[in-house]
A protein has these predicted regions:
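Metabolite-binding pocket within alpha/beta catalytic cores that recognizes anionic/polar moieties
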Residues: 2-129
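Single conserved hydrophobic/aromatic residue that forms the stacking wall/gate
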Residues: 165-174
Length: 174
């Protein structure tokens, strides 16, 4: 039987969550360099949970400087099987006002200045992205959101861009 290990990639505010009682900070190195920051190991009831601040504690890494490969590899070294990524983003849709949580089921990567693969010159591999999210994780997120009485929407598409400002209104037609 597989024991799932959860990691959350998100903002630095989760370091201050009171429910995270037992805390251990882990330093890891990867073949792709160092991850964004130390990884927080904690427990939620009896389950291990890991947290990695995408931009580093203190928010010192801009989106274009995040070492995604090192972040994912570090979590893999810890035996993480499931990752939930939480982001504060803008929306071009009126029915997605500020504060509404979206459980995405698709994404579009419109970035252009970062490495997007673990497979470099020596390995050629094709990874299907037809269904990039896990129904099990989406269901677990939805249950937690319902318990917290947060306004949310199930299913949506996240579009990643290579700049730090919000997109133009015409971007909705891309």
């Amino acid at each position: 039987m597989t024991i799932n290990k959860l990691a959350i990639i998100g903002g630095s505010g989760l370091y201050d969550v009171e429910e995270f009682k037992d805390r251990e900070l882990i330093d890891l190195k990867t073949p792709w360099g160092e991850p964004s920051d130390q990884i927080l190991k904690t427990k939620d009831n009896t389950k291990e949970v890991y947290f990695l601040p995408r931009h580093g504690r203190g928010h010192f890494l801009s989106p274009s400087n995040i070492n995604f490969r090192a972040n994912i590899d570090a979590l893999k070294q810890l035996g993480v099987t499931d990752i939930v990524s939480v982001s504060a983003v803008g929306s071009l849709k009126e029915d997605l006002p500020p504060g509404k949580f979206v459980i995405v089921d698709q994404f579009i990567d419109r970035t252009f200045s970062r490495i997007k693969t673990f497979f470099d010159d020596e390995i050629v591999a094709h990874v299907s992205m037809a269904h990039p999210t896990s129904n099990g994780l989406m269901n677990a997120c939805e249950e937690a959101i319902k318990k917290s009485n947060i306004d949310y929407q199930r299913n949506g598409t996240y579009v990643a861009v290579s700049y730090t400002h919000l997109t133009l209104p015409t971007s909705q037609y891309v």
